[in-house]
Amino acid sequence: MFLAMAALACAIGLTVKYGSTYRPVVEPVREIEEIWALEDAREESEEPLVTRLFCNGVPMAYDAENNVFYGSLGLDNGAQWPEIKLTASEETAKGLSLCFADDYGFDDCDAAIREGYSYQIFAYTDTAYSYAEVVFTGLPLVNVTAEQTIEREDVPAQIEIALAAEGLQTNGRIHKRGGASILNDKVGYKLEFTRTTDGKKKIYREIPGMGTDSQVILLPMNALDTTMMRDRLSWALYARLTRRDEPFSARKTQYCELFLNGEYRGVYLMLEPFSVRQEVAKAGEERLTTDSVYRTAVISLSHGRPCMEDPYSAATGFELYYPMDGEPDFSPLADYFALLGETDDAAFMRRAAQSIDLDSALRYDVVLQLFGLTDNVINNMYTWAQNSRGHTRYRFDFWDLDVSWGLKRDEIGEMHENWVFFPLVDRLLRADEEGGVRQRYGEIYREVREKAFDTEMVEALVGQYAHELNDSGAMARNAERWETENYAADGYELVAFAAERIALLDEPVRAMSAGEEIDLRFLEKTNYDDKGTPLSEE
């Protein structure tokens, strides 16, 4: 760790608590001999004298194993340090004095954050002393304390989120979340905010960097995604296609660093979760009494919700997400299954015209193809059954966007050259003798390309994420914590993937939508269990 031993600063008699008027730890510079004199008159404590500090009134996270405090300063300071006031709580500060044993002011702020420089602080009472270290990060900090073991069921927790001068302290609850990823060492979590310490009575809070919500998801990011950018990039581009008032619109995201019961857990992606009930209500309050929402899922990894087996794929099913009161009802899916089972193409097209929200299905497929989403058809797809006067119409929306941008899974290859199967849309395109579906597909494709998908957009976002991960010092800390080789983020492979997908898809989609003669063999294979087939045999 970097130590700048050139100067000292002290403060005496801290008597402050979060939210009250506070006094700074750092006072005028003192000579090193004064610190030595304080040491000589006291015994070194076997335990840290302070494990709770605030930076500018905002809680700091504490790595108990390494005795290191972390403070969030954001990434907008440049070389100039912001005013920093470290304080202890009233209970901790009784009889305790604190000072820096290193002067961070001798370093540039941005360099100190980027390189993860640590600065010693000296804590002492009349009889004892101890040292600790302080590290400043550019990312938000999430600090969770739970007395019970955290598993899939909710347990009460104390939650703190800090970003520069913004801070949140709240009661809440936490549980592990995820499918196959829950078996990894680095797992995801869901945090919900509550009024009471027992994790009851959910409430909304202002989340630093994210806005107001009652919950957040902390994604460990796919273990195979060494860039740590795929999920965030996908949602950012999808946000260019959806309005906030539109059902199942793009989710807000931000990187953060997580501390759990005093243990540093590395970099996570904080994600705004869907409240399915609220999303349904965006289409009109009357929908809450008529509609149902299901999520496709691999049954072995389902989330414990009521689930119906997919009649066309034994390993997968449809989980019920709304409504959750009363007996589980899967009858709204009957017309959808009947459509998928229709053997006559002409009859299939007539049924589809009556029961499928065509623009929803086509936009879903266009995003599927451009982003290379290989885990969003037989898994992780919302199927929304919208009932009007006894007639059901189906809309499709994304549940997550992580297995994307050429990410490998199940030895399927990098997917750069593959058309990703969505059997419903594949057949709509293949059986479209009149050409209207193909023409509309081309229109939506051009709209998505124009609004949300070109290499310049991708490159700009990837550059921003690399800045956040690298210049915050967080990527290197995550690599050290999880013993990976990914000490620096660049995301170049995502930019390369975007360029390859554009080159591969633009011409076939243009020709298909224009009614030109084109080899459509890539649409012919509709096995639900297949993830894709090459667009070109070259």
Q: What are these model-derived regions, one by one?
A:
Residues 2-17:
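Hydrophobic membrane-insertion alpha-helices, especially the h-region
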Residues 20-115, 124-130:
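Predominantly extracytoplasmic/ectodomain segments of secreted and cell-surface proteins
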Residues 224-247:
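A conserved alpha-helical element in kinase catalytic cores
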Residues 172, 330-331, 338-378, 384-386, ...:
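Middle-to-C-terminal accessory/interaction subdomains
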Residues 33-44, 114-175:
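N-terminal module-boundary/linker segments of secreted carbohydrate-active enzymes
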Residues 92-96, 241-256:
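Short, well-structured beta-strand/strand-turn elements
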Residues 190-192, 215-220, 228, 257-259, ...:
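Structural recognition of the beta-strand scaffold that forms the well-ordered cores
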Residues 197-198, 206, 211-222, 247-249, ...:
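Internal "kinase-insert"/substrate-recognition segments embedded within catalytic cores
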